[in-house]
């Protein structure tokens, strides 16, 4: 992320009669990466200031590779900006292509949102893999347990045993 910031910094200066450039970080990062680390790299390598000379935003990727029931267009897009003007520019960009854009108050909130989504998934996959081991020793079919638990219309989300987290 930071090396990319170094590489794109020289291109941030707006041309005459054009709007400020927009940089949107999409990678999974820890809270503070956009408004501290990336901003520092972009500013120090361009001589420009985020929010004043260029827009800076964060919007986490939310895809589930291999699933065909959700498209990039239909998955709500969490967006944030370094300043309110940066947020507006990010909302304008994604609203042109995404059905639902969900603005949050800061880049840190958006970064923490992505981490929370990933942690939720990781914890539940780890849990169901452990349950599979325990239930097998007890002679219980974990797949049947998950299907039965899935009949509860609230408070349960099925996760299935597998080789790990996957991703890309």
Regions found by a protein language model. Name each.
Residues 1-168:
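Structural/interface elements that position substrates and couple domains in central-metabolism enzymes
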